[in-house]
Amino acid sequence: LFTQSGSYAANIEKAVSLPSQPIPLRDNIAEWLETPHQKTILDICDNNNLDPTQIIKVVIFLAQFEDEFEVPILACIRGDQHVNEVKLFNLINKLHNFNLLNLKKIEDKNTIEKNLIDFPLGFIGPDLDNKTIKASSNWEKKWTRIIDHSASDLSKFISGGNKVNFHKVFQEFSFASKDYLIGDIRNAKKGDKI
C-alpha cells in the first residue's frame, strides 16, 4: 500500500492507517433484530437498512501453541473491515509465554461440535459466554477477546445476539471494561488516512 504522494508505503501486514468514520446508528432501532438466514454483513445491511460501519462482526480463531496448548480467540472488527491474520497472529504471540505455531479460523462443523456448545455460528456477539466452550474440549476454557481499534470506540452498534437468527443492538458497551485487548488487527485499505 502507498499514498498517492508517495510519502508513505508499507506492506499490508505492517500498514498502520485510520479507517473512515462510522455512520451513527439511528436512535429508533429495536433492541433485538430478527435476522433469519442473514449471516453476512451484506445480508444484515440490505435487510435492515444498516451500514457496515454500524456493525461489529465477530470472527473466531484457534491459536495453537507448542505443547498442544490451544486457545480460542474472539476477534471483533467493524463490519466494513477485514481481519489481517498476520497482525492477529503477531498480537496473540505477544500475549502468551508459549510459541504460537498456528492460527486458524474456526468454521468447520466438526471442530465446532467437538469443542463448543450452543454455538450460534453467524450470530456471534462480543459478549459470548465462556460456557460455550465444552468442558471436554482441549481448549483453554476462556475466550481470548481482541477488538480492533476501528470498532473499540463504538458505543452503540449491532452485533450477533448469541442466538440463531438474532442480532442485537449494544448500547454503552465498553470494551475497555470487558477483558478485551484493543489492537490493530485490520487490513489497511484504499481510502484510509495515515
Region locations from a protein language model:
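Extended, low-hydrophobicity, polar/charged segments
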Residues: 1-194
